[in-house]
Structures are given as structure tokens and as C-alpha cells.
Amino acid sequence: MIELRGLSKHYKLSGDVLVKAVDKVDLTVEEGEFAMIIGRSGSGKTTLLSLIGGLTKPTAGSVHVDGVDLWSMSDSEQSRFRAEKIGFVFQIPSLLPTLTVLDNVKLPTMFSRGVDKVGEKALALLEMVGLSEKAHAYPSQLSVGQQKRVALARALMNGPEIVLADEPTSDLDKATELEIMSLIGKVHEEGPRTLVMVTHNLELVNYATRVRTMDNGVLSKSAGQ
């Protein structure tokens, strides 16, 4: 379960201009739920996702994941907790160009023991996203849609209970968009995993179990399914 209470992130610009990227957000995402946050570019949804995942420190408020306050931990404790509990799918896949597709998927567990099992799991995840034949290719040899599928496989490498996805279908044609959403739906259902996705695309709302809208840093009280 994810619980946000009074969560805010404010930035001060030159001339003492205060930007409320996220402002007083209250949100509970139940275990196994697929929550989707819809908003235009600049609405604060990516910042909110970063706050949920512990990548950005809030100005005020709290983030609890499975009852644990993320910001009550030391940096090392938080990093360990995040690595074990949360998988991230970023808008830009950011695959390392000098590593093969397989090694990119293995990155979250690169220093784990049992290398053979790590390799087997990475191959199984590539099979799941339909890219096992690209295991020894390099990111530059993949389309944007294929890179996003690799990023999804990488996010699942540690077996996270929670997946946070930032605009995973951006810059894709309709057919590839549907492929990615079908995979995300599969990830949610087969876990079952708690999934929070942010997007500007209203056409995707039917994939979620609950939908909220965001504008100017404020999350709607109700826009749900």
C-alpha cells in the first residue's frame, strides 16, 4: 500500500517566485491496485511519481510504503528499501549503450550472487516482453518501442511489489502503444503488483482500476473508475 499525506514539493525560482510542483496531495493506493494519474505536461505528475518513489525529497508531507515512512530512513536504508520494493519505468528508457540488452536488464542485480540465476531471470523477462531474440543486441539496434520494453523488463528484475511508470507510451505509434499497455496490464495482473502510472493520454484510462487527474500540482479528489 502507498499512502501520501499532505505531500508537497515547492521550488523557489529567482525573484522569490514559488513554484508549487506538487501541493498538499493526499492519496492512498491499495495493494494490487492499478492507479493512473492523468495530466497535461507540466501538471506535476512526474514530480509526484518521483516523490512516491523516494527519488525526490518532499518539502512537506509524508510518503508511506507498506506502512514505512520513506523519509524516516537513512539514505542507505532507503536505497535498499527502494531497490527491493519498487521498480521504475522512466519516460526515457536510458539504457546503457555499451551493454547488451540482456546486461541492461540484469543491471539492478549486477552485483548479486548466483549469476546464473540472474541471467535466467533476465532471459525469462525478455521472453515475457517478446525480446528474447534481442538478448545480445545493443540498445542502438532497437526501436524506441523495443527499448521501452527492455526498460519494463529491467524494472521487474528485482521482483518489486510496486511499479511506478512515467509516460511509458510516449513517442510511440498506436500499435506499439497498445503492445506496451498490454504488457503493463499483464505485469499488474500476474503479480499482482501495485502499479502507479502517470500519463497525458486519456485514451489509456480503461487499463486502470482507478483514475485521478492532476493540474498545477493539485490532485483531484475524485475522478475514479
Specify the residue positions occupied by each region the protein language model found.
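ABC family nucleotide-binding domain
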Residues: I2, S8-V25, V29-M214
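H-loop (His-switch) and adjacent beta-strand-loop-beta switch element
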Residues: V211-A223
